A protein has these predicted regions:
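C-terminal, flexible cofactor-proximal segment of oxidoreductases
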Residues: 2-5, 12, 332, 341-492
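Beta1-alpha1 glycine-rich phosphate/pyrophosphate-binding loop at the start
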Residues: 2-93, 174-175, 181-224, 470, ...
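FAD-binding core/adjacent interface of flavoenzyme oxidoreductases
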Residues: 2-14, 85-175, 271, 491
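Short glycine-rich anion-binding loops that position phosphate/pyrophosphate groups of nucleotides
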Residues: 25, 122-125, 187, 276-278
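Rossmann-like dinucleotide-binding core of oxidoreductases
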Residues: 168-224, 231, 242-245, 327-346, ...
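FAD-site-proximal beta/loop scaffold in flavoenzymes
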Residues: 2-6, 134-164, 256-259, 264-335
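A Rossmann-like FAD-binding core segment of flavoenzymes
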Residues: 84-100, 112, 191-299, 303-305, ...
């Protein structure tokens, strides 16, 4: 066990477990470790995340459609984890040999040492797969959902005063690239949202609104039962008049335009929901990875060359006993978190870790208001019943009855009224000025501040190096503090 000096609120001579990522896997791993180590005064749990909340990602679709308040689908990490030290920062890199994590946040850079490390950094949208993908919106974070909702409302506002019919139709065309489960669920919620707001615009004809779902494979949602995928396609086409185009190759995304192998679509809203890759931090780690960039771990979720490093969620490829990988679903992340926490506790006590084994309960997806589909324990469900079961399941996953009640109230109002048309700006003049002031202040500090020297006898656990932040790091920190996070999808 390594020693530590008491700095920045850290206690001396404690084994430190550092968890990187504030998603389902990271937060629930910390929660289970709190319970297991509640009588261990020699253990410290530290969770690092760029956001100070746990986002219930399965409910993010309804934030975008306005059926759910954004605050009601997120849980403050500090309130949820009372015995864990929370650090709001962005993970820049991990040094596996020195066992330290490089962090950046709040206009300063520092190192955080660990004895046990948990990688739960999630995944990010693979923008490298399509040229020009920077011209498309993404859907991974709370900021993405609010930005997308505002973007669609703004397109309707512009279309309402547009006199050119062709330009109006282009503004009202929504294209989603990616026909997997996420793309289809988002497609269903957005069509319901547009149906709700369209009557408010007197100079917009519903027939001018066009929905296009592009999928490279032979069918949409290849990860689920073909019968359920066909049901989803029929519902979307019948209810919304959507165009579902399979076996379609996207060549390039231009501003307001999608170039296909067989033509071009002009669109006011383009969303990239195809392809995810592990975070850039994971990509830079010198460990064995599979062809998709996932860390290769053993059955106990440990890295092969570094048994003190554990991974779960979207970071690793965890193989089931039959030889197939477990799907990257929230239910698996929750179960992985429980097993991983138990294995770390075993490691601290000199016991052998246990392999992760879990039988998938099933998969469910929403198609918008009153429609859903799923397969639960091998039984197919669809329609209103599936919609109700899906909502009930995710409602009960939300910690605390206070937030559950707020969600139920939101859902009740959404059933009885049309979506709200308020267009929320994601930036402001005041935020821009504040960001500029922070950048200038950080730069001045970096010119005047001397590098803090640590004691020769200080342990490697000392949180280091307030050595003066370079301007590039200050810019990243300022952008994170003053605006929404870009849609990288990582949880760091």
């Amino acid at each position: 066990m390594a020693e530590t000096t008491q700095t920045a609120g850290l206690s001396p001579r404690r084994t430190r477990i550092v968890i990187l990522g504030g998603g389902f896997g990271g937060v629930y791993a910390a929660r289970h470790l709190e319970n297991l180590c509640r009588r261990r005064q020699d253990v410290e749990i530290v969770l690092v995340s760029r956001d100070n909340y746990l986002l219930m990602t399965p409910l993010l679709f309804e934030v975008c459609s306005g059926a759910l308040d954004s605050f009601h689908c997120s849980v403050p990490i500090r309130a949820f984890l009372r015995a864990t030290r929370f650090v709001e920062a962005t993970v820049q890199s991990v040094d596996l040999e020195r066992r330290v994590v490089q962090l950046a946040g709040h206009a300063e850079s520092r190192e955080l040492a660990y004895d046990q490390l948990v990688l739960a950094l999630g995944a990010m949208t693979n923008r490298a797969m399509i040229p020009g993908s920077e011209n498309a919106l993404t859907f991974k974070t709370l900021g993405d959902a609010l930005l997308l909702r505002t973007h669609i409302i703004e397109r309707f506002e512009r279309a309402d005063i547009e006199s050119d019919p062709e330009r109006k139709r282009a503004l009202l065309t929504l294209v989603i690239i990616g026909g997997g489960l996420v793309g289809v669920e988002l497609f269903g919620e957005l069509t319901a949202f547009v149906d709700g707001i369209a009557p408010y615009y007197k100079h917009v004809n519903r027939d001018d609104v066009r929905f296009v779902l592009l999928q490279g494979a032979e069918r949409i949602m290849p990860e689920i039962d073909p019968h359920l995928a066909d049901y989803g396609a029929r519902v979307l086409e019948r209810r919304t008049g959507a165009e579902i185009r399979t076996k379609t190759v996207v060549r390039e995304i231009e501003p307001g335009k999608v170039q296909l192998s067989d033509g071009t679509i002009e669109a006011g809203t383009i969303i990239l929901a195809a392809g995810i890759v592990p975070s850039s931090v994971v990509a830079a780690l010198p460990v064995t990875k599979d062809i998709r960039g996932h860390i290769v771990v053993n059955a106990t979720m440990q890295c092969q060359a570094h048994p003190e490093v554990w991974a779960l969620g979207d970071c690793p490829q965890i193989m089931a006993p039959g030889g197939n990988p477990y799907p990257n679903l929230a239910q698996h992340a929750l179960r992985e978190a429980k097993t991983l926490a138990k294995n770390i506790f075993f490691a601290l006590n000199g016991r052998a870790p246990e392999p992760f084994v879990y039988n998938t309960l099933g998969m469910m997806g929403s198609l918008g208001h009153g429609r859903a589909f799923g397969q639960l324990l091998g039984v197919r469900v669809r329609g209103v019943v599936a919609w109700f079961v899906r909502r009930t399941y995710y409602l009960m996953q939300m910690p605390g009855w206070g937030r559950r009640l707020r969600i139920m109230i939101d859902w009740a109002f959404a059933l009885l009224s049309r979506p709200d048309l308020v267009k929320i700006s994601v930036d402001s003049e005041a935020a821009s000025l504040l960001r500029k002031a922070k950048l200038e202040g950080a730069f001045a500090k970096s010119q005047n501040e001397q590098t803090t020297q640590t004691d020769g006898g200080a342990d490697r656990h000392e949180e280091v190096s307030r050595s003066g932040m370079r301007l590039g790091n200050a810019q990243r920190a300022g952008a994170t503090q003053a605006g929404f996070h870009p849609g990288t999808g990582g949880e760091s």
